Swiss-Prot record:
PTM annotation (Phosphoserine): residues: S42
Top enzyme class: oxidoreductase
Keyword Nucleus: yes
Alphabetized PROSITE patterns for the sequence: ADH_SHORT
Signal peptide (UniProt feature, chain positions): none
Location (main, coarse): cytoplasm
Record-stated family: Belongs to the short-chain dehydrogenases/reductases (SDR) family.
Modified residues (Phosphothreonine): T43
Organism, as annotated: Schizosaccharomyces pombe (strain 972 / ATCC 24843) (Fission yeast)
Protein's cellular compartments: Cytoplasm; Nucleus
Name listed for the protein in its UniProt record: NADP-dependent 3-hydroxy acid dehydrogenase
Entry keyword annotation includes Repeat: no
Length: 259
């Protein structure tokens, strides 16, 4: 029996990468209701079918763009009754666009990153938090990044968004200490996902170079850490976790084997 059994878990950015892997890791060990939210509805529909065919879970695929801030309250309020009583929110949706230095910054890309990574995460939290306060318990797990702790050239906006996530998470934790609401953050280092393809606007060669001759983490590695955090006893909060592959020591400190 898992401590997650019977819970309703909402994951944003669930169509690929860490979000998708987290859904599978949870489904393997717990009888839960999963709400898989993403912009690519057809993709989360297929994931939902696969999960329900393999595991004892109920899955609701949900079309959601967290950058559409005004739509979020309505989406949460209109959830089907059997999925409305959310117990866990995993704020995973996020992206990086470009590696421009500030002098060359694409402001449209900056607005997209800030809206998605920061305001979207805040809006999701704001929409779900009343459910948790009403029962004095619930889990919010925000997926951050090493970039929120250590900046690098070409990452000014993305690093800023993840720093903002960290401070928001910390403040929320302080605001909820008189409850059983747990506020957690998991910060991955180098993870091989679609993240870099998106960052380089679909240029797969540039994306592949990010991981070239290195041994990055997989989405499953981070999903396992998320599952661990969520399955601790209710009095235990895995507040802030940094996860590196064994050959990484910092944002720009990655050992690469000689070709």
């Amino acid at each position: 029996m898992s401590r997650l059994d019977g819970k309703t878990i909402l994951i944003t950015g669930a169509s690929s990468g860490i979000g998708k892997s987290t859904a599978f890791e949870i489904a393997k060990v717990a009888k839960v209701k999963l709400i898989l939210a993403a912009r690519r509805f057809s993709t989360v529909e297929e994931i939902a079918k696969e999960l329900e065919s393999k595991y004892e879970v109920s899955v609701l695929p949900l079309k959601l763009d967290v950058s559409d801030l005004k739509s979020i309250p309505g989406v949460i309020e209109s959830l089907p009754k059997e999925f409305a009583d959310i117990d866990v929110l995993i704020n995973n949706a996020g992206l990086a666009l470009g590696t421009d230095k500030v002098i060359d910054l694409n402001i449209d890309d900056a607005v997209t990153m800030i809206t998605t990574n920061v305001l979207g995460m805040m809006a999701m939290t704001r929409a779900v938090l009343p459910i948790f306060y009403s029962k004095n318990k619930g889990d919010i797990l925000n997926v951050g990044s090493i970039a929120g702790r250590e900046s690098y050239v070409g990452g000014s906006v993305y690093c800023s968004t993840k720093s903002a996530l960290a401070q928001f998470t910390s403040a929320l934790r302080k605001e909820t200490i008189d409850t059983r609401i747990r506020i957690m953050e998991v910060d991955p280092g180098l993870v091989e996902t679609e993240f870099s393809v998106v960052r380089f606007h679909g240029d797969k060669q540039k994306a592949d170079n990010v991981y070239k001759n290195s041994e990055p983490l997989t989405p499953e590695d981070i999903a396992e850490v998320i599952l661990f955090a969520l399955t601790r006893r209710e009095n235990v909060v895995i507040a802030d976790t940094l996860v590196f592959p064994s050959h990484q020591g910092g944002a720009n400190h990655v050992y690469r084997k000689q070709a």
